[in-house]
Amino acid sequence: MISNLFKSLRLTIAFCLFFSVFYIFVLWLFAQVAGPNKGNAELVTLNGKVVGAANIGQNFTQDIYFWGRPSHAGDGYDASSSAGSNKGPSNEEHLALLEERIDTFLVHHPYLTREKVPAEIITASSSGLDPHISPKAAYAQAKRVADARGWSEEKVMGIVNSHVEKPLLGMFGTEKVNVLKLNVALDQASNNKFLISQLDLGYEIIRKKSSSLGSCILNGIFYVG
């Protein structure tokens, strides 16, 4: 019996060392060698000012910008509280929130019907940090952004198309658009009116909490619908 107890104890210690030291080291080493930006946050600058991290979504609500996915991570896009809502598809509170988001989206996009509202725009990702939307979700917002900026829809669509990222190696993930990079490109095309750099986007929170290695790697490689 004592012998079995020591075997169990040794096995427990071995697993603790493996998963808390060796496994973490292997992930870190992989990120340093093969991960985007060596597993660190990809900082995005505009007019000499850091406006966010490309690996972590932000809450854009103005009509002149494209909107990303909702977030249930902390107060929103908090890498230290990465999570979804964990509410089931039949949860009444969840369904009411979806209806509210659909109504809000349609107020700003009256040219769309309820059936045309992109599902990803009203549903949060499992990480709560997703910085990407699909090209389809961006196209649905193009007219609203164009009208708000006084541009032609074709001009906005051209900027969107130039920011569509292909699947990794042509097979991993799907096509995606980084919302922050897209919005920065809009401002860069706005006769030097760098609007994002004037916004309080909570970058200090992002800077301090964007060391969530797993989320940064996954969001940098895949688009998770």
Task: Provide a role label for each language-model segment.
Residues 2-19:
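Aromatic-residue-lined binding/catalytic grooves and analogous aromatic/hydrophobic interfacial grooves
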Residues 221:
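Short acidic/glycine-rich loops and adjacent helix/strand connectors
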Residues 211, 215-216:
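Targeting/processing segments of secretory and organellar proteins
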Residues 7, 20, 27-148, 164-167:
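Flexible, solvent-exposed loop/hinge segments and secondary-structure transition points
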Residues 3, 96, 100-103, 158, ...:
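Solvent-exposed alpha-helical segments within well-ordered globular domains of core cellular machineries
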Residues 140, 144-199, 203-205, 217, ...:
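Extracytoplasmic/periplasmic C-terminal soluble domains
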